Amino acid sequence: MGCTHSKEHSTANKPPAVGILRCHGARWMPAQAVVGTNSYLFRTVHAEVKGLRYLDVRAGKELSVSQKKALKEAVKELDAEGVVAITGDCGSFVHYQTAVRRMTKTPAVLSPLLQAPLLATMYMKEETILVLTNDSSDYDQAALESNLVEIGLSQEDAERFVIQGLQHIEGFSTSEVADMSDERTWAMVDTSERLRLEIMSTIEAAKKANPSLRAILLESTLLPSFSDSMRQTRGVPVFDAITLADYLAAASTDNPRFGSNIDASVWSSAMERANVMDELSQRATPAIGILRIDYSYPPAPGDVDYPGSYYYRTVQEVAAGLTFEAAQEGRPLTAQQREAMEGAIRRLEAAKGVVGITGDCGFLMNYQVDARRMSHLPCFISAMMQCHMLAASFAADEEFLVLTANGKSLAPKFGEMLSLAHVTRPEDQARFHILGCEDVDGFDAVAKGEAVDVARVTPGIVALAKAAAARRPKVRAVLLECTELPPYADALRHALRIPVLDAITLVDFVHSASTDNPAFGVDFQKSSKVFV
């Protein structure tokens, strides 16, 4: 089958693309699966792994010499297309996550399960996440936990993810998915009300059995077209192959709301996405709560506290007494600080439409555990939570820059923050390198609480990062810890040509799990559409 786009065409003037590895002979319908080009608001290319069939992938079969060669060729094919990330058309590709990330410098996130560490961090230890798979008779709870531990979760956290199979519904059993030998109309083509109701009934039964369920993770790549129905019916976030692919693309795409739009020919798809998302009314689209530290400053476009940084509504509440200095030190909360923080979180929870809570300072990672204990909503109060995604996406010897307002301030608690993000092994923590921006011309305004001249500061931020990347040739991505650094993300993406994650990519990612997908789905928030 090969890539759907010819290698002969230059990628210079094409929008960013996500590469998708396909099982050999897979013919599930595009409208139903992750491979559908209409499922995305960016370009996708596909490469078939010859000889590696669905049954092999599902079982996590050890690759033969020929299969390993075919996998390398497929990855090479996708890299030749200039893809910004590589994923798989089957959640069971997680078995080959380690192998593939050794084959490429492109971030490889082969399964929706790679979102699990972020989810585990967002919710309390007592809360659970339902994992929907095609068939739990051959991918059971033990297999799921084994994969999650291999990804990087502790056994305790892995047990919080509860498997639920759909093999009792026509079209989902492993044998039915694998049986594509004829041209008959496959059962999964059916998106009838009957099928939707069967899936929703299964979820409802799982919820009754697990009352602590707070989110749904779709391991199956055949299910994203039902995500909106799940969001509408269950009222909980639903993470799937599409939320993951969107997240990966955003890390390498110009931000249309405040970005540089440096090369319109390359980043035009970002503007197309902006136009689609701007059709959603902020009144009906879910909102995000922002927990603010006790620190006042004029935010620039792209800052977490700047309302225009989002296409949706945000609500802000200050934790009085929790100062910037206190957040930096990361000491245990005083009684007064704890009361103020909990009060702010309660007010955010009570605000209309709020579906999750973030923070306006990366150092709040020190209080992520406190925040999630105080709230029934998902809490993701620091960009540092994304570190595990980086560690898992690249080869074990590849490295990352973590840009911060002041390197000396971040260093003392850096290891603890990484551990909270499920980056626990010393060899993995050593892959993350702090890069302080305190000496960049004009950036001292951040420490002074003054307005930052973004145009003045940008060249210095870029020069700093380029010099650091030159010293460390194995750097493959950048994380912006500070919530005042996203205004420079696009300039860094353009200069370094590597993914840049920040507080905005994190917030957009979590928000997408509770929002109507404008590319497909049931449009359950249609009252929010603005027709022009």
Curated annotation (Swiss-Prot):
Catalytic reaction equation(s): S,S-dimethyl-beta-propiothetin = acrylate + dimethyl sulfide + H(+)
Enzyme class, first EC level, given as a word: lyase
Highest taxon in the source lineage: Eukaryota
Extent of the signal sequence: none
Keyword Aminoacyl-tRNA synthetase (UniProt): no
Coiled-coil residue spans: none
EC number: 4.4.1.3
Molecular-function annotations in GO: dimethylpropiothetin dethiomethylase activity; racemase and epimerase activity, acting on amino acids and derivatives
InterPro entries xref list: Asp/Glu_race
Record's keyword terms, sorted: Lyase
Keyword Lyase: yes
Functional note: Mediates cleavage of dimethylsulfoniopropionate (DMSP) into dimethyl sulfide (DMS) and acrylate. DMS is the principal form by which sulfur is transported from oceans to the atmosphere and is a key component of the ocean sulfur cycle.
UniProt similarity note: Belongs to the aspartate/glutamate racemases family. ALMA1 subfamily.
Quaternary structure and interacting proteins, as annotated: Homotetramer.
Stated name of the protein: Dimethylsulfoniopropionate lyase 4
Species for this entry: Emiliania huxleyi (strain CCMP1516)
Gene of this entry: ALMA4
